[in-house]
Amino acid sequence: MKFTLVATVLLTFSLSAFAVEYPVLTTASPDQVGFDSQKLHRLDGWIQNQIDAGYPSINLLVIKDNHIVLQKAWGYAKKYDGSTLLAHPIRATTNTMYDLASNTKMYATNFALQKLVYEGKIDVNDLVSKYIPGFKDMPGDKIKGKDKLRIIDILHHVAGFPADPQYPNKNVAGKLFSQSKSTTLEMIKKTPLEYQPGSKHIYSDVDYMILGFIVESITAMPLDRYVETTIYKPLGLKHTVFNPLMKGFTPPQIAATELHGNTRDGVIHFPNIRTNTLWGQVHDEKAWYSMGGVSGHAGLFSDTHDMAVLMQVMLNGGGYGNVKLFDDKTVAQFTRRSPEDATFGLGWRVNGNASMTPTFGVLASPQTYGHTGWTGTLTSIDPVNHMAIVILGNRPHSPVANPKVNPNVFVSGLLPAATYGWIVDRIYGSLK
């Protein structure tokens, strides 16, 4: 009996000795972690000036040395109903959820892939066709090579796919038109390559739609269920979901986006296009119409606190508290610069040269990585300075500047706040 008790104690001690406990976020004053509070406070007035000039809202959170040192919201989660300015607009709060747009690629699809790679369930050198049957060149394709494409080619955005085939818009997509998920996968298989794989980097939504299907193939689960149950729930995240209106959230909890659906103030039309102000539904057309709101490239909603936890996972080398998703080797593998273009990792955008200044500013370390989202979102993770910044915004919640000239430029997009590096540099410039 005594031997059994001793053995049990030793085993318990042995297991606890090898248990990994990762840092968790706490709050601290800016001065405690090396900021000049007075300089950082000047950011408040500058952002408010942008709100006064017409930028809808900005939610900002800054992490330094495992501490949240700044978390604040400016502006309005909803200020328009169609073209009408609301008499009583809804203010943004630090709990407001935002459409992450292409940050979905990192914090849903990449997190899932990093977890699966760490668990040995997938190798980035695997062929795409291993997980998507029928993924091959089509008769008549002018550029060949689909059947030789690897997951790493998709992650590096060198696979040959066009940036945006606009599957839900029949006027543009033609024979590739799709407004259902099952049809969309078949249309992706039929999408012709635009350039010889490996010859250049072209950032493509199609790449991440493919990766989302691969995650579903490996896990035998819808992408949203997989990430929500195996990543977000263990981390204690409460506001990070796809299709929030179907999962218990209400519009007032979420920042609104485009004023007239996806019509760009009435100049774009296709079957089933939304025309009402978008509020709680993903803005991205392919994600909404072609994928039912859940796609590897867009569709995720979150708030700044949940995003802070996800960024801290990366800074920690793969875990948070007693939750381990992957390891530091996996983080290094996915954030390593591509040999052909120093601004691309495996999915992650890297601060590899001056072309990334509008994103990461001029003061972040060259090892900084992160991503942006079309709706006005940025994540910036700097392992050298042990610092991370998340900016969430609803930039399309303003009129289109000149619909007939360029329907994708919103009035708010012409303001300095639309260039994330302006905000990022003001934060770094506040370090002592």
Curated annotation (Swiss-Prot):
Subcellular location per the Swiss-Prot or TrEMBL entry: Cell inner membrane
GO molecular function, a single term: serine-type D-Ala-D-Ala carboxypeptidase activity
Superkingdom, natural source: Bacteria
EC class name: hydrolase
Main location: membrane
Transmembrane domains' residue ranges: 7-25
Keywords, sorted A to Z: Carboxypeptidase, Cell inner membrane, Cell membrane, Hydrolase, Membrane, Protease, Transmembrane, Transmembrane helix
Catalytic activity from the UniProt record: Preferential cleavage: (Ac)2-L-Lys-D-Ala-|-D-Ala. Also transpeptidation of peptidyl-alanyl moieties that are N-acyl substituents of D-alanine
A cellular component term, taken from the record's GO annotations: plasma membrane
The EC number(s) this enzyme carries: 3.4.16.4
Membrane topology: Single-pass membrane protein
GO biological process: proteolysis
Family the UniProt entry places it in: Belongs to the peptidase S12 family. YfeW subfamily.
The name this protein goes by in its record: Putative D-alanyl-D-alanine carboxypeptidase
